[in-house]
């Protein structure tokens, strides 16, 4: 699986992917978040990456250099050159087959290649599948945090050389 930087023509497919995942009801995603403005901003900033296979957009991930959580006293231990991994999303039709682990590894490899030394992320507290994905991949649970009107679990992981 190779993540490539998204381009403006990817925006409709990314938004459709987000909506398909939102319908699963395992997170706070809905018709208002993530929205077209967020997708356009991520593409403009060069922080949105996608995975396509046979022309179909199957996954997306955003790697931010900074996010609000970096300024919050959440108890991160790995604070040297972190990125914030957000909006990690795999097509519902591809879930449950180990591809989520591959997507997470691809996002970590990309972050490492971009010079980041740690990953910080928020996981909706209701999303037990994502919680298992992150803990299974070696992410350290930091805390629970009520942010943006929702309850999140905060995770982090240092990025080591492969």
Ranges and model annotations:
Residues 9, 13, 34, 57, ...:
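Short alpha-helical
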Residues 90, 96-109, 132-136:
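Conserved acetyl-CoA-binding loop-helix of GNAT-fold acetyltransferases
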């Amino acid at each position: 699986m190779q993540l490539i930087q998204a381009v403006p023509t990817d925006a409709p497919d990314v938004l459709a992917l987000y909506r398909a995942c939102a319908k699963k009801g395992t997170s706070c995603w809905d018709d208002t978040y993530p929205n077209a403005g967020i997708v356009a901003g991520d593409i403009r900033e060069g922080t949105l990456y996608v995975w396509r296979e046979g022309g179909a957009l199957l996954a997306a991930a955003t790697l931010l250099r900074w996010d609000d959580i970096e300024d919050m006293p959440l108890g991160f231990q790995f604070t040297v050159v972190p990125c914030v991994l957000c909006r990690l999303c795999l097509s519902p039709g591809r879930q449950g087959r180990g591809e989520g682990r591959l997507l997470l590894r691809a996002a970590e490899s990309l972050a490492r290649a971009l010079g980041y030394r740690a990953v910080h992320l928020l996981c909706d507290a209701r999303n037990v599948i994502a919680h298992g994905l992150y803990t299974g991949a070696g992410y350290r649970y930091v805390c629970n945090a009520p942010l943006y009107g929702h309850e999140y679990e905060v995770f982090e992981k240092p990025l080591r050389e492969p």
